[in-house]
Amino acid sequence: CASSYQIHSMTTSTIAALTTHDTTRIDDVRIGAVRPLITPALLEEKLPVPAAAEALVESSRAAISRILQGQDDRLVVVVGPCSIHDHSQAMEYARLLKAQADALSADLLVVMRVYFEKPRTTVGWKGYINDPHLDGSFAMNQGLEMARQLLLDVLDIGLPVATEFLDLLSPQFISDLVTWGAIGARTTESQSHRQLA
């Protein structure tokens, strides 16, 4: 094929010129920095799922399934703040919620709402994963690690968790810890989110 011949016959200097051409005046003009993202496998290796947390996720997913199928008379109640922005406050809330969840367990399956991402129709803080320090630094690797650690800590006290999957990358880092994954109102018409569901 002529086009593959042309590609294969490019000289080293031509290829070097292609890869070093400065397009910063026209490409990604609103991007301040590009940083590598940790892989899900590395984060899971750093913060693995303990057996007790895995068992809780599995049993609470099964319980929700039974409730939705009418095989369990309890109600599923997802309760929690609009979004997470502080680990210690989230854990204080989780401890208080755990006491209520235990007291009401005959009638309710309580799942803590732990939403890390904020859907935005305008500019604004995008959430704990995207900007964990609330300072515009967009330290996403830290945000992903902090989010995963928080989920592990909530599971450790015995509460299942729910979150909204807004960014399609986030589930790869935290879905193994989530009992209930939600697709929000702003993304229900998104084909990629429907495929995720």
Language-model features: where?
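N- or domain-start disorder-to-order transition segments that initiate the globular core
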Residues: D28-Q71
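Short, Lys/Arg-enriched N-terminal segments with co-localized hydrophobic residues
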Residues: C1-S9
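Active-site-facing alpha/beta catalytic cores
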Residues: T11-D27, D107-A197
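Conserved, mostly hydrophobic/aromatic
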Residues: G80
